[in-house]
Amino acid sequence: MQLNSTEISELIKQRIAQFDVVSEAHNEGTIVSVSDGIIRVHGLADVMQGEMIALPGNRYAIALNLERDSVGAVVMGPYADLAEGMKVKCTGRILEVPVGRGLLGRVVNTLGEPIDGKGPVEHDGFSAVEAIAPGVIERQSVDQPVQTGYKSVDAMIPIGRGQRELVIGDRQTGKTALAVDAIINQRDSGIKCIYVAVGQKASTIANVVRKLEEHGALANTIVVVASASESAALQYLAPYAGCAMGEYFRDRGEDALIIYDDLSKQAVAYRQISLLLRRPPGREAFPGDVFYLHSRLLERAARVNAEYVETFTKGEVKGKTGSLTALPIIETQAGDVSAFVPTNVISITDGQIFLESNLFNAGIRPAVNPGISVSRVGGAAQTKIMKKLSGGIRTALAQYRELAAFSQFASDLDDATRKQLSHGQKVTELLKQKQYAPMSVATQSLVLFAAERGYLEDVELAKVGGFEAALMAYVDREHADLMQQINQTGAYNDEIEGKLKGILDTFKATQSW
């Protein structure tokens, strides 16, 4: 078969017309150095701050230093096989994590990947880990309570929905225990919980997850893990990832509670990254923007108004406010709250719960020091009954501390002073509480009523715990309806006062403890 020149030229023209080049523009660069999880890349002209850079082997790095002739990026994951000369690409994307209800009851890593062996995570889309906090106009004042289930916290240092309340103290003072109990207490409150574990041992995190499961609270909780064995980059990003997951509920008119355990370890991870990127060190070798590291995270915890929720959901949710409440944890060294990171976070948050090792070792648990613990906005969120009955508790404890310091030097004390000391000791004893045993508003109110109205005067100090346990069992058995009513309304009036008085009078007359 012979082709003439006309046919050949026609065929070539046809092929040229059909030919289509699919070109994909990539901003590509070359790794010029790798050390300690930090890569320097040359040739990335259009990279953004915080952009994900695609590495060989389906891994990513995050661009943190944009310099004149190179980009400093931190690798998320293993980096031992990365070498000079390898090609990397810009993705044009900021780091995002999966969000949605499907994450509840799951344990995930910083990137939202499941690590609990329960299969893939169902999600409702992705959300950027870095987000701008709601503005002043979009917020609403805090006026609804978050009950932790701890008498000492709910009475003296109340927490409201949308508040940031710092939990601060030395190691082994019960900070995580307080946070975990607060999560357990939200089982039936409708508040979704996120627990972010940063730089902790995997065995400790596994224990927390097991306890949440035992007490039926895991189904309502997302656990985000960046354990001590993870890279500094993942430890630094974990709180932001957890916050993005919490904002999903906040922006849809629901309430969420997030625990950052703890931000001291996140600051140390960020310091490590910054020093490896050769950023100039400041106080305690932290970089200059360590305040911004925590402020941009904690400002995202807020109560947003109904207009914000309606606009965000495009009219699907109307008349509902949303909130994200944060309980950041900070670990101090030898009780030094004036160190750099603790003072930063104290100034960012709306109050702090200070846990003291001396109190913890003396058997006063939770080891809350009511003298320097404060809640700046939670008072407006307290239920009416708690507000009414908790007023005298803080005063009684303050007077007791003052007199206790005094009485060490005085040999003979008058009756009024003795009475005040005895009352203070009994209130201190009454505020003790076992772990994993959060109390409802009604039972807390009854106990506070007993302390406030002098029902403990003739109870021996050693029997205060027994008195409380017997009282709890008695009201559960005989007055469950009243307890339910108080839990639902939180109201306090002459009728409820009379009923509480009647319960205690009958209990003291007929029961033993």
UniProtKB/Swiss-Prot annotation:
Molecular-function annotations in GO: ADP binding; ATP binding; proton-transporting ATP synthase activity, rotational mechanism
TM annotation in the entry: none
Gene3D superfamilies the UniProt entry points to: 2.40.30.20, ATP synthase alpha/beta chain, C-terminal domain, P-loop containing nucleotide triphosphate hydrolases
Site positions per UniProt: Required for activity: S373
Membrane topology: Peripheral membrane protein
Main location: membrane
PROSITE patterns attached to this UniProt entry: ATPASE_ALPHA_BETA
Assigned keywords, A-Z: ATP synthesis, ATP-binding, Cell inner membrane, Cell membrane, CF(1), Hydrogen ion transport, Ion transport, Membrane, Nucleotide-binding, Translocase, Transport
Cysteine disulfide partners in this protein: none
Record's catalysed reaction(s): ATP + H2O + 4 H(+)(in) = ADP + phosphate + 5 H(+)(out)
Residues the record lists as binding ATP: G169, D170, R171, Q172, T173, G174, K175, T176
Localization in the cell: Cell inner membrane
Subunit-structure text: F-type ATPases have 2 components, CF(1) - the catalytic core - and CF(0) - the membrane proton channel. CF(1) has five subunits: alpha(3), beta(3), gamma(1), delta(1), epsilon(1). CF(0) has three main subunits: a(1), b(2) and c(9-12). The alpha and beta chains form an alternating ring which encloses part of the gamma chain. CF(1) is attached to CF(0) by a central stalk formed by the gamma and epsilon chains, while a peripheral stalk is formed by the delta and b chains.
Entry-linked PANTHER family: ATP SYNTHASE SUBUNIT ALPHA, MITOCHONDRIAL
NCBIfam families, per the entry: atpA, PRK13343.1
Family: Belongs to the ATPase alpha/beta chains family.
Functional summary from the UniProt entry: Produces ATP from ADP in the presence of a proton gradient across the membrane. The alpha chain is a regulatory subunit.
Name of protein: ATP synthase subunit alpha
Species whose genome carries this gene: Edwardsiella ictaluri (strain 93-146)
